[in-house]
């Protein structure tokens, strides 16, 4: 099975260490990456099973796994721990993500050449067995292609106005946006641009 959550052996090692604690807190791991640079960064993306996560919940995860990582000490060098939401243009790492975001535009890459290409951009059309279905524009036609999940090396949603609008609507419907915290928009009746 393809592992888009934790790609490298170090990512998988970190996942083995932190995933049980994150799940015990009631969250799901979306992606784990150890990224190099001047200082290594351990990036963990998580969310509630129903989607979404707030800053306080990220801090809760960070505090819980910081203690664990101090004990396990899996990284030799200094590192920064970054716990965040997957974001709007999120990575798609689990088969269920492709069902959840059916109807939205995504970019996908495969490890194998399929029809002479490895990169695809289209509208997610769900899942059938272990295949991710994608509607691709080919000329004036739309063709549905099934990509084996195990062949995927990368996948993420494309940031579109439609996606932003839907995510904001979901947050508002879930009561996560309190409109009373925003300033009222004042219009100047003497200014024709308002």
From Swiss-Prot:
<dbReference type="GO" id="GO:0006412">
    <property type="term" value="P:translation"/>
</dbReference>
<keyword id="KW-0963">Cytoplasm</keyword>
<comment type="function">
    <text>Required for maturation of 30S ribosomal subunits.</text>
</comment>
<dbReference type="InterPro" id="IPR003728">
    <property type="entry name" value="Ribosome_maturation_RimP"/>
</dbReference>
<dbReference type="InterPro" id="IPR028989">
    <property type="entry name" value="RimP_N"/>
</dbReference>
<dbReference type="GO" id="GO:0000028">
    <property type="term" value="P:ribosomal small subunit assembly"/>
</dbReference>
<keyword id="KW-0690">Ribosome biogenesis</keyword>
<dbReference type="InterPro" id="IPR036847">
    <property type="entry name" value="RimP_C_sf"/>
</dbReference>
<dbReference type="InterPro" id="IPR028998">
    <property type="entry name" value="RimP_C"/>
</dbReference>
<dbReference type="Pfam" id="PF17384">
    <property type="entry name" value="DUF150_C"/>
</dbReference>
<protein>
    <recommendedName>
        <fullName>Ribosome maturation factor RimP</fullName>
    </recommendedName>
</protein>
<dbReference type="Pfam" id="PF02576">
    <property type="entry name" value="RimP_N"/>
</dbReference>
<comment type="similarity">
    <text>Belongs to the RimP family.</text>
</comment>
<dbReference type="InterPro" id="IPR035956">
    <property type="entry name" value="RimP_N_sf"/>
</dbReference>
<dbReference type="GO" id="GO:0005829">
    <property type="term" value="C:cytosol"/>
</dbReference>
